[in-house]
C-alpha cells in the first residue's frame, strides 16, 4: 500500500509520528509505515556517512616514507621516481583532507598531477597500480591513443571517468578520490612545436579535452559509455580531487635535452656540466623540453610533478625476477610446489632471460612471456610425472638449446 488514505483508519509514520494528512506519501510495510520525509532524511544520512567514510580513509594516508616502503616491496630500481611519486601522492590526499576539514579560504592548495617519462617496460603503469592498491582507492587505466576530441569517431575522454566509476562500483563519492593513469600520452603530442591551423584528431585536440577533466570540472558521463545523446541520463562527477598520472616513453626527448644543454655549453661553458649517458639526460628534463616534444603549455602546466624513469639494466631485471613479493620466479616456484616439485633457476638462466628482454626492448613487461616460453613444456608434463622432485632451468633451456634438467627421486 502506498499513499492509501482510508476514511476509517488514520495511518501514522512509525518514525516521526506524522499522519498521512501531514505528509505527501506514506509507504506501508509489515506493520510498519514510513513517510516520504523520513525516506529523504534516511538517504541524506547514508550519503553523509559514506562521505565521512571516504574522508576518514583520507586521514589515514601513509606518510611518504611509508609509501616508499610499500613501493620497494614490489618495484625494483627507479629510486628517484619512487620518492617523487610518494611525496606527490601523499600531498595530493593531504590536500583533499585539508580542504574538506577547513571552513576558511585562507589557503588554496592546488592539485599536483603527475607526468611519468620512461621507456617501455620501466614500470610506469605498475607504479601507478601499486600506489592505488596501497591506498585502497579506485584505479582506472586509459590509453591516450584510443581517445579523440569531440565530434570524431573514437572514444570520448569522459569514458576514462566511467572506467573509474566502474572501478568504484558506481560509488561516485569514492571515484571522486580515485587515481586515473593515462598511458601513451606522448603519442598525442603535436607533430611540431609550431601551432597548426588544422588540428589533428588524436593530438592537440585530445590534450585540450583531457585538460578540462585534469584541472577539475564537473563532467557528465554516460552510464553505458560511448557517445553522449540528447535526453540521455548522465552521471555527474567532480574531477577536482581525482589524481591524474600520465605516462609515456617520449622516445627522442633526450635529444631535445642534449640540444638545450649543448647550447648552454656553447654560451656558458664555465657553468655547464658534462652528462655521460641518456639515463642522466632523462633526469634533466624540464617543461621546455616537454613542450618542444609536442605537449601544449596548458597541459604541461597541469602536470607539475615530473618523474623520470630509467631504462632497466640486466641487474635490475634479475632483481625484478627474484626479489619482489610478486616476483615471477617466486610465482612459478609456488605453482610447482603444489605438485611437490622444487624449481630452481640458475644465475646464468636469469641473466639470459634478462638479456632477451633487453634485446626485445620490452623491459620488465616482457619477462613473463619469456619465462612462459621456457616453462610451457615443464608446466604441462611435470604434474603427471610423480617421480620428478626438482626442475632446474639453465641458460641453454632459456635459449632453446636444451630442455630443463629434471631430478628424479
From Swiss-Prot:
Residue spans crossing the bilayer: none
Note the CDD domains from the entry: RecA-like_ClpX
The cellular component terms of Gene Ontology attached to this UniProt record, alphabetical and capped at eight, are: HslUV protease complex
The record's keywords, sorted A to Z, are: ATP-binding, Chaperone, Metal-binding, Nucleotide-binding, Zinc
Any one GO MF term held by the record is:
protein dimerization activity
Superkingdom: Bacteria
Q: By its UniProt entry, which Gene3D superfamilies does this protein fall under?
A: 1.10.8.60, ClpX chaperone, C4-type zinc finger domain, P-loop containing nucleotide triphosphate hydrolases
Q: Tell me the InterPro entries matching this sequence.
A: AAA+_ATPase, ATP-dep_Clp_protease_ClpX, ATPase_AAA_core, Clp_ATPase_C, Clp_protease_ATP-bd_su_ClpX, ClpX_bact, P-loop_NTPase, Znf_CppX_C4
Q: Name one GO biological process term.
A: cell division
* Residues that, per the record, bind Zn(2+): 13, 16, 35, 38
Binding residue positions for ATP: 119-126
Carries keyword Zinc?
Answer: yes
Q: Where is the ClpX-type ZB domain?
A: 1-54
Q: Which Pfam families match?
A: AAA_2, ClpB_D2-small, zf-C4_ClpX
SUPFAM superfamilies hit by this protein: Glucocorticoid receptor-like (DNA-binding domain), P-loop containing nucleoside triphosphate hydrolases
PANTHER family according to UniProt = ATP-DEPENDENT CLP PROTEASE ATP-BINDING SUBUNIT CLPX-LIKE, MITOCHONDRIAL (PTHR48102:SF7), ATP-DEPENDENT CLP PROTEASE ATP-BINDING SUBUNIT CLPX-LIKE, MITOCHONDRIAL-RELATED (PTHR48102)
Q: Entry's HAMAP family? A: ClpX (MF_00175)
Q: How does it assemble?
A: Component of the ClpX-ClpP complex. Forms a hexameric ring that, in the presence of ATP, binds to fourteen ClpP subunits assembled into a disk-like structure with a central cavity, resembling the structure of eukaryotic proteasomes.
The family classification in the record reads: Belongs to the ClpX chaperone family.
This chain's function reads:
ATP-dependent specificity component of the Clp protease. It directs the protease to specific substrates. Can perform chaperone functions in the absence of ClpP.
Q: How is this protein named in the record?
A: ATP-dependent Clp protease ATP-binding subunit ClpX
Origin organism is: Streptococcus equi subsp. zooepidemicus (strain MGCS10565)
Question: According to the entry, what is the taxonomic lineage of the organism?
Answer: Bacteria, Bacillati, Bacillota, Bacilli, Lactobacillales
